[in-house]
Amino acid sequence: MQAVRNAGSRFLRSWTWPQTAGRVVARTPAGTICTGARQLQDAAAKQKVEQNAAPSHTKFSIYPPIPGEESSLRWAGKKFEEIPIAHIKASHNNTQIQVVSASNEPLAFASCGTEGFRNAKKGTGIAAQTAGIAAAARAKQKGVIHIRVVVKGLGPGRLSAMHGLIMGGLEVISITDNTPIPHNGCRPRKARKL
C-alpha cells in the first residue's frame, strides 16, 4: 500500500501542463490520498446514515416502460400502454400517417395525396408536414391529446410528419423507429441508371 502512495505522489509531482513555463501545477503529498481502512469504514457508515435518513420513494424513470412492466408515469390519467399511436410510413414517393387507439382502432388518417399533393410533390417534406397537421386535427376531434409515434421508412417526410403532428396540437410522448432492415434477406432490385 505504501508503494502505491509513493508512486502516486511521484506521478502528481512530475505532471505539468505544457504552457506552464516549468511551473509545477499539481504538487500534493501522498498523505492526502485516502486509502486507509478507517476512512473507508467512516465513509460507508456515513452513506448508510444518509440512506436511512432519505425518504423512501418509488423508482422513477423517464424512459418508456418495458412491455409487461408497470410504470408510475401518467399522461392525462392514462398509462403508457393506453396512449394512442401515430404510425408514420415515410416512403420516397409519399408519407402516410394513421392515428390508432391503444386497442388498434383507427382514429384518423392522412397522407400527402389526400391533402392535395400530386405526383413528385407527395415525396416532399412540406407535403408530409401538411399531412401531419391534418392528421393531428382529425385526431384532436376524437379527443386525442397525447400520442406515441412509430416511424417506418427512410423517406424525406419522416421528420416533417412528426413536426406536423406537434404543430397540430398533439403532445408526443415517445418516438419509435420501426424501419425494417434486412439481415441479408432478399436480393435488392437493381440500381437506377440516371
UniProtKB/Swiss-Prot annotation:
Name this polypeptide is given: Small ribosomal subunit protein uS11m
Q: Name one Pfam family in it.
A: Ribosomal_S11
Give the record's family classification. Belongs to the universal ribosomal protein uS11 family.
Show the coiled coil region(s).
none
Can you supply a Gene Ontology BP term from the record? mitochondrial translation
Name the gene that codes for it: MRPS11
Query: InterPro entries this protein is in?
Result: Ribosomal_uS11, Ribosomal_uS11_CS, Ribosomal_uS11_sf
Q: Any idea which GO molecular function terms this record carries?
A: RNA binding; structural constituent of ribosome
* Location(s) in or outside the cell: Mitochondrion
Major place of residence:
mitochondrion
- Give the quaternary structure: Component of the mitochondrial small ribosomal subunit (mt-SSU). Mature mammalian 55S mitochondrial ribosomes consist of a small (28S) and a large (39S) subunit. The 28S small subunit contains a 12S ribosomal RNA (12S mt-rRNA) and 30 different proteins. The 39S large subunit contains a 16S rRNA (16S mt-rRNA), a copy of mitochondrial valine transfer RNA (mt-tRNA(Val)), which plays an integral structural role, and 52 different proteins.
* A single Gene Ontology CC term: mitochondrial small ribosomal subunit
* HAMAP family cross-referenced by the UniProt entry: Ribosomal_uS11
Per UniProt, the keywords (alphabetical) are: Mitochondrion, Ribonucleoprotein, Ribosomal protein, Transit peptide
